Amino acid sequence: MANHKSSLKRAKQDIVRNTRNKSRKTALKTITKKVDALVADGAAEDAKTTLLAAQKLFDQTAAKGTIHKKTASRKISRLTRRVNAAAK
């Protein structure tokens, strides 16, 4: 365990940030799986509406620095391609 006051504070902040980031990443994985499940079921309209929510969540998470901006863009792009392919 940390001995200095500043390192104790840092350790506490790390725990809080770790928890927050883990929650955000879990939400991203969940909504991605939800979109994929809707695509697999053939529910194209539901998949499109869920895709919009997923895009918003990816952009917000990237803006907060939990994931990189280009990672968010890549994942949104791949999700969009899957949804568009299912709509055809």
Curated annotation (Swiss-Prot):
Protein's UniProt name: Small ribosomal subunit protein bS20
Upper taxonomic lineage: Bacteria, Pseudomonadati, Thermodesulfobacteriota, Desulfobacteria, Desulfobacterales
Transmembrane segments: none
Pfam families: Ribosomal_S20p
SUPFAM superfamilies: Ribosomal protein S20
Gene Ontology CC terms: cytosol; small ribosomal subunit
Superkingdom as given in the UniProt entry: Bacteria
Organism: Desulfosudis oleivorans (strain DSM 6200 / JCM 39069 / Hxd3)
Function recorded in the entry: Binds directly to 16S ribosomal RNA.
GO BP: any one term: translation
Family matches, as InterPro entries: Ribosomal_bS20, Ribosomal_bS20_sf
Biased composition (Basic residues): 1-10
Sequence similarity: Belongs to the bacterial ribosomal protein bS20 family.
GO molecular function, one term: small ribosomal subunit rRNA binding
Keywords in alphabetical order: Ribonucleoprotein, Ribosomal protein, RNA-binding, rRNA-binding
Region (Disordered): 1-24
Signal peptide: none
